[in-house]
Amino acid sequence: MVAIENKEVLFGGSLKSTEEYDQFFCPSIDIPKFLFKYWDSKPLGKNVSSDQFAETAIQMLEYFIQNNYTGPYLPIKPEIWLPQRLRDEATLKDAIIKSLTVEGERPYRLAPKLLFLLLSQTLFNYANSKDPLHIWYKARLDFLHQQMLKEHVSELFNQIMEGMHIVSSHVSSLDRDLQGRFTMEMGLIQSYYGRDTLALQLMKESAKVMDFHFELTGALGRRTKFQTFDTSQLVVLAKSRDRCKDTEQNKSTSTQPITFELNDDTLLEKISFKEDQKSLAPSEELDPILSSEDPNHPSKLDPLDASLLLAFCHIIKNNNPDDGLTREEMAPYAERVLVYPVNWSVYTMALLVRARLEGFKSRTVERSVLQMQALLDQLNDQLSFGKSPEGVDKPENDEGLGSFLPKPQDGENSASLKERLNYFYNLLMPSRWQLEAELAERFISVGATKSALEIFERLQMWDCVVMCHCSLNRQDLAVQVIKRELENDPYDFLLRTLLGDIENNPKHYVEAWELSCKRFAPAQRSLGKYYYKKGDLLQAMNCFNESLKINPLSYPTWFTYGCAALELQKYDAAMEAFSRCLSINPEDGESWNNLASAMLKAKDHTKEQAWHAMQQGIKYMYDNWRIWENYMLISVDVNKWSEVIRALRRIIEIKGKDEGERAVDVQCLDLVVNYVMQSCDNDASGLARMLNELLKMVVPLITNDVRLWRIVARYYLWRRHFAESLNATLKAYRILISSPNVTSDEATWNKTVEGALELVEAYANLGEMPGRMGGVVAKDWKFKSRSVLRSLIGKGKNIWENTESYQKLESELENLK
């Protein structure tokens, strides 16, 4: 099946009169409805099959990708296919933007030839083809549409998932590479929407289907020119299966993008690994298929397998903090892909990933900037709007990108269209404007905000311009920009919402909501935040609810909605909110924690259910002591004493170094010790051993808390460690007697007397017990007891001698004579 060739007939450009379609042109233009009516009323719609419409839709989609992402420039002016009355540039652009706006979210206005995207979408919708391949391409279109919007929108997400679900039932009949390609695309979609756990599973499944073996491991090697010894380095070992068909895709390509050498006086161009195979990880831990891989001379990868490595790189970034360790883990994946230039698009993406990673190091930042500039120039040259006099998408202020690199000669480093598009859907490739905006964001991260501002102004990304002005504390300029642009386009809902943020005025949120016909979810979300900060939680929940009706994929909205519900004691609403948060991101420990808190107070849920929810939370917030503290308290309530001990240990590990004994929850520790002493027959039980290890961590932290020494003394006494028990009691007394308030505060004096009498009692009970090194614990226990009492009596004489506690000391001393 081939695409329809006569586009003027297809899209109504040959119409001499459009009076019968006036309803679609006034008061505003609705291109999709016009085309639907046109196709229904003309023989064309009846004589052309739905498959031909779908094939034409695929053609339009690839035209759009070619003009915005991959190049080379396509000198086709799609608006000439439309009726004459639709060809006014400004009016047509507004109509296209309006048709591509979803849930109030607009695509980038200056994206060249957006009409291709709209025509593709309209053709797919009209065709309604049942062919799995066409449904797959429709899902690809929807995902590309989503990537052009600022926020995730549920309408497109649902369409994508529905289409991919239909295709998944037919995938098993395809060859293994197509199965792997489909699974990889599904993984990228899930990762884009923040579902990285599922995405990771899909990527592993894709590798398994394609019989692609790879592993991140360690090998001995050298990173610098003057290094005299080998150290452990991360490396990705990967091997593609032998494909039967030796097609062009498996051969190296000479049409690779410009690649820059590092040219550093210290760092090697790439890591030099030790030639000895023993430098790799132990063979029993390594996939046998990879054991023959040489890190210095790896085998050539299939482009599809290389795409999968880059997809894994993307998931690692999403799953980990944005820090040096994460970048070190990502780098070997990109380096493995860059060994051989097997495909232009794959190689371009690998260079971009490496440039992103190298922008954070002083020795590699120069190559990072040069490489990113080269990739920008490559797109700028190949997507140049000025090549054809018929290009109508060139903005008036588009002066092109400034470059300090020489321009390539015509045809230099130019790949075929087929090579560029072949793996596009398996790579999250940025468009020209997205790449330039990314460069501007890099400038912001290093403090060059003014340079970023210039780029955003040239791209007419006014929301980013506003944010730059605000970061420079020039809110006045930000407001000027917003008001100027709103005069040109009153329906820019995002700018109107930003104006509300800057002026802290809710009327702008309301205006954005009303102008969007109550479809722009961020307006209600911002209004909800406004009321939340003011403390009007009920009104905030109402606003969040309106926002979530439009966009239920917004994790921040669900989370804040849940927090407001918790504060208002609406526990069912809170549970729903945090459950939705977890459906979006199952690894969000804070949502698990809040869900458990709501379950604890809800009528229809047990503490056991809350405990299980909290148990999930600590998996993902392992270093958060507050989460562990909550888990500890719930574990006490449900009598999970081993988990109480585990939580106490973890809290001490996190806080002990900075807070010392304050990191220990004395009450929980006391409860655990009591439980172990009552329920365990001896100190050989598992729980007793766990408690013993815990107390080994507690004892070095104790400085001034008498309660802790008393707990330790009681536990050692139960274990029949008499000397240790007596020593703990003595240390508790020393803390009391060292207080400067013993002679001035009667309460302190009474506590000290109590401690002294406890110590004397311990001497009497334990002094004659067997000691650690033979003999008894304290042979002279009476002498030591008298010394303790005399010392304390001497301190209290003339101050507390008329008190009852003082009389107790004298009486006890008399008994010891």
UniProtKB/Swiss-Prot annotation:
Gene3D superfamilies: Tetratricopeptide repeat domain. GO terms for cellular component: cytosol; nucleus. Keywords: Repeat, TPR repeat. InterPro entries: TPR-like_helical_dom_sf (IPR011990), TPR_rpt (IPR019734), TTC27/Emw1 (IPR044244). SMART domains: TPR (SM00028). Pfam families: TPR_8. Residues 276-298, 386-413 are annotated as: Disordered. It comes from the Eukaryota. TPR repeats lie at residues 459-492, 521-554, 555-588, 625-658. Signal peptide: none annotated. The keyword Repeat applies. This is TPR repeat-containing protein C19B12.01. It comes from Schizosaccharomyces pombe (strain 972 / ATCC 24843). The lineage of its organism: Eukaryota, Fungi, Dikarya, Ascomycota, Taphrinomycotina.
